[in-house]
Amino acid sequence: MTEETDLEDLRRGTDLVKRGFAKMQKGGVIMDVVNREQARIAEDAGAVAVMHLESVPADIRKRGGVARMADPSKLEEIIEEVSIPVMGKARIGHTAEAQILEAAGADMVDESEVLTQADDRYHIDKREFTAPFVCGARNLAEALRRIDEGAAMIRTKGEAGTGDVNQAVTHQRNIQRSIGKLEGMAYEERDEWAREHGAPRRLVHETADRGRLPVVNFAAGGIATPADAALMMQHGCDGIFVGSGIFGAENPQAMGESVVAAVNNYDDPEQLKEIAKNPGKGMKGQANADLDEEEQLQGRGV
């Protein structure tokens, strides 16, 4: 087999292969982009992958209305422009959007609460696809349900488009705290926890035995500064998604480079001090506490 064929096999196929491709992004930063020019900036700044969508989450909030999958021709343009993986967002439960993204060549599909939910009851059956999926979660039970459906990567939901990292921290702490509790439980107690929380029993035991999720777990939702990115890595995340925080900043190139540097040096305060001096003014934020319940995106798709 050629090197190209080996990479293609890693990108698509079995559950193990899909998880392997997702794991290749570990330790990196994935940046939201709306066009090929932004994708080039993200790649030059050190992103390990880009996530294409029609508008960044902060603009989706401002615009209102129905947020849908972006034009797949734009995704194809970005694939031609950059050498890093290109991901695309589909609405929760919208199988057809995910099929289109896969056909367009998306390296990974994000079944995303940032877009308007298409199905109030069911998520996409991600096992039916060859492209890997990433899904958001606020707690361990949500994460394990998404993995059971075939997700190859989990991310915190946070509260996208706000520039407020509070909810991303809360969701990551929720997941870590529950894993710690499971580790200290007897086998029968884990079974009871699975029943009480509506989580797949098999995955509950696997998570407890591993001491972590069975798939990579990234931070997302409200990450707007290098310090935010470092904080989430310190909380045990495997990598970072940054949405509005890059191209909503005064200098996207500098902000992108600084976020990548912060992830690479998250446990070195001296390095972080220097990194924090460079990026310029960040995006204008909105505190989570100021959002009405109907304005919150994180409750979509439990």
Curated annotation (Swiss-Prot):
Region named Disordered: 275-302
Instruction: Quote the catalytic activity from the record.
Output: aldehydo-D-ribose 5-phosphate + D-glyceraldehyde 3-phosphate + L-glutamine = pyridoxal 5'-phosphate + L-glutamate + phosphate + 3 H2O + H(+)
Going by the UniProt record, its keywords in alphabetical order are: Lyase, Pyridoxal phosphate, Schiff base
| Disulfide bond entries | none
- Give a GO biological-process term: pyridoxal phosphate biosynthetic process
**In what pathway does it function?**
Cofactor biosynthesis; pyridoxal 5'-phosphate biosynthesis
> Per UniProt, where does D-glyceraldehyde 3-phosphate bind?
173
Annotated active site residues, numbered on this chain, are 89
Keyword match Lyase: yes
Q: How does it assemble?
A: In the presence of PdxT, forms a dodecamer of heterodimers.
Q: Outline what the protein does.
A: Catalyzes the formation of pyridoxal 5'-phosphate from ribose 5-phosphate (RBP), glyceraldehyde 3-phosphate (G3P) and ammonia. The ammonia is provided by the PdxT subunit. Can also use ribulose 5-phosphate and dihydroxyacetone phosphate as substrates, resulting from enzyme-catalyzed isomerization of RBP and G3P, respectively.
User: To which protein family does this belong?
Assistant: Belongs to the PdxS/SNZ family.
Query: Which named protein is this?
Result: Pyridoxal 5'-phosphate synthase subunit PdxS
What is the originating organism of this protein?
Answer: Haloarcula marismortui (strain ATCC 43049 / DSM 3752 / JCM 8966 / VKM B-1809) (Halobacterium marismortui)
Q: What is the lineage of its organism?
A: Archaea, Methanobacteriati, Methanobacteriota, Stenosarchaea group, Halobacteria
